[in-house]
């Protein structure tokens, strides 16, 4: 409890400030590349569901054209590649588009490690997360679900992983997730754009339905 309520917050602030200072040159290079590649702002802002169900604006480097659907998850788009810019492809494959969430950490809206925040439009999975107690903690830049399948698993499976994380928050868990995330990013593992259920089945990774998740967790 001490780690979750105090030490984890202090670590987040320290890491966020240090990262912001160290990565300023990287931010500058990415900003120039985005502006050179396509019209639109450097940062993409989107409403997400945060701790205790509070709405907040998440920050990302913009990776899509202005014509892209704003409030639809990428996995629901049949051909997401048509909306992603050339610079955006690089940023998404390397997860560099997530770097601006350092500002969310400084504002106290996000943690380095925690359940990824969902869109407000994803009401069904948000209800499941609230029921599972996941919204009791701050959302994270990376989490247990991200090192156990990321885009390859369904939202319902992510709920299971996120609940497991919330029930077992500790420094060792966070450290393990952090280093495994770095490993996954370097390998570019489990990053699929617009993955459909039938495509998951071809990979032998068919996602569970929400009803099945409810039956397993009643």
Each predicted region: which residue ranges?
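A hydrophobic, helix-centered structural microdomain
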Residues: 1-66, 176-218
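Juxtamembrane loop-helix boundary motifs flanking transmembrane segments in multi-pass membrane proteins
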Residues: 2-6, 79-83, 98
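Amphipathic alpha-helical recognition patches that constitute DNA-binding helices
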Residues: 5, 53, 86, 101, ...
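Hydrophobic alpha-helix-in-membranes signature
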Residues: 24, 99, 114-116
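Hydrophobic structural segments characteristic of membrane proteins
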Residues: 41, 49, 103-218
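Short, glycine-rich, amphipathic interfacial segments at transmembrane boundaries or analogous
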Residues: 44-83, 141-160
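Short, well-ordered beta-strand elements within core beta-sheets of diverse protein domains
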Residues: 87-94, 163-167
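Short, conserved beta-strand/loop elements in beta-sheet-dominated catalytic cores
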Residues: 89-111
């Amino acid at each position: 409890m001490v780690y979750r309520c105090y030490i984890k917050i202090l670590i987040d602030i320290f890491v966020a400030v240090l990262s912001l200072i160290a990565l300023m040159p990287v931010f500058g290079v990415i900003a120039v590349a985005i502006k050179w590649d396509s019209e639109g702002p450097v940062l993409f802002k989107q409403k997400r569901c945060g701790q205790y169900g509070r709405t907040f604006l998440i920050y990302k480097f913009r990776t899509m054209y202005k014509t892209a659907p704003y409030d639809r998850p990428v996995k629901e788009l049949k051909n997401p590649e048509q909306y992603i810019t050339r610079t955006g492809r690089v940023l998404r494959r390397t997860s560099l588009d997530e770097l601006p969430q350092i500002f969310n950490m400084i504002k106290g809206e996000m943690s380095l490690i925690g359940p990824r925040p969902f869109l407000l439009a994803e009401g069904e999975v948000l209800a499941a997360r609230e029921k599972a107690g996941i919204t009791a903690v701050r959302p994270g830049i990376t989490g247990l679900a991200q090192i156990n399948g990321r885009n390859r698993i369904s939202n319902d499976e992510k709920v299971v992983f996120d609940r497991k994380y919330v029930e077992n928050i500790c420094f060792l868990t966070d450290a393990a997730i952090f280093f495994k995330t770095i490993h996954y990013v370097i390998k570019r593992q489990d990053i699929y754009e617009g993955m459909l259920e039938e495509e998951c089945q071809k990979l032998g990774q068919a996602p569970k339905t929400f009803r099945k998740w409810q039956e397993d967790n009643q």
